[in-house]
Each structure stands twice: as structure tokens, then as C-alpha cells.
Amino acid sequence: MGAPRDIATRAPAPARTATGRRIIEITIGALVVAVAAQVTVPVPFTPVPMTLQPLAVLVVGGLLGAAGGLAALTTYLALGLLGLPVFAGGSSGVVHVIGPTGGYLLAFPVAAAVTGALAGRSAGVLRTLLACALAMAVIHAGGVAQLALLGGNPAAAFRMGFVPFFTGDLLKVGLATALILGLRSRVRGAN
């Protein structure tokens, strides 16, 4: 019977290389979102800051595909929950997942998967734009839902969690679409 390392070396070299490349892509995707989270702008009358996270979530999902985007954003959440300062403004911990911004954070993996599933390698401009818009809607649905749950007032949650971000997020959807279309041929993990 061979040593355990013999089992690992039996996989064909291209499979090992592809798996390693995929792990690197997922890790880079998580780090891109972590860096984007550090760009924060406080918004009056809401506990939710404006960040570049949603833009990064859409781009990571669009470039890595549904499974890769889901894995990258799940990794991102795990890093933050483990105490690494990857959430907005260098924060971390479970308090951010159960607090006012938690709904957005928990929606990120789903949004990345939606973008990746709909904005595949052959998707044109319109399909990619719609994928990004739908994914942004997923992010806002999660965020507003958690704000409503915590505050008990759905109308106030909508005013605090969606209205101040609408215009900026339209721009992020357009920019994400352009970045996905411009970069996806360079990323092998795109579906």
C-alpha cells in the first residue's frame, strides 16, 4: 500500500494545476472584496456606509462564475467571522453579521453566484448588465430585510438601506458590467 502522498501525486498534472489555479482565483476574489470594503463613505441618517464592496462582489461573481463567486464570498465572510479585518473600515466579527450591515454581507455570496450564473463567458452586454442589476437587487433585499428585522419598520429600513445608495449602485452596476466584459477573457475561471 502506497504512502498518502502517492494518492495526491496520482492525479494528472493538469487537474492539479487547474485546482491550484482555481484556489488562487477564489482567494484573490475574496481579497478584492476585502480591499473594496476599506473604501467607505459614511452616509447621514443610516448605519450603513457606502463602500465599493457591491462593485467587487458583482465583478468577482461575473469573472469566477457562480461556484467560484460563491466560494470567494463565502471565504470572505469566513475570514471576517474569524477576526480578520476584512469588513467595511477594517472591522471583523460576528457583530457585523448580526448587526445593521449583516443582511448585505450575507447576501454577497448569493449575489456573486447570481452574477456568475447569468453573466457567463458568452453573455453579451445586456445579459451581463441584467445579471449585475439582479445581483445588486439581491444585495439590497438582504440588507433592507435585516434592517427591517432589527428596527421593526420596513419603510424606515427601505429609506435607510436602499434610497441613499440607489444612484451610486446604478453606477456600480454599469461599471461592474464594463469590468466583467473587459476582463473575463483573461480569467480562466469564468463559466
What do the PLM-derived regions correspond to, one by one?
Residues 2-15, 35, 94-139, 147:
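Short helix-perturbing small/polar motifs within transmembrane alpha-helices
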Residues 2-70:
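Hydrophobic transmembrane alpha-helices
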Residues 23-28, 55-59, 69-75, 101, ...:
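Hydrophobic alpha-helical transmembrane segments
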Residues 27, 31, 35, 59, ...:
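Generic alpha-helical transmembrane segments of integral inner-membrane proteins
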Residues 37-44, 83, 88-91, 119, ...:
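Short helix-capping/hinge motifs at transmembrane helix termini and TM-loop junctions
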Residues 42-114:
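Alpha-helical membrane segments and adjacent membrane-interface helices in multi-pass membrane proteins
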Residues 63-67, 114-122, 182-187:
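Structural signal for the C-terminal ends of transmembrane alpha-helices
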Residues 122-191:
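Membrane-embedded alpha-helical hairpins and interfacial helices in multi-pass inner-membrane proteins
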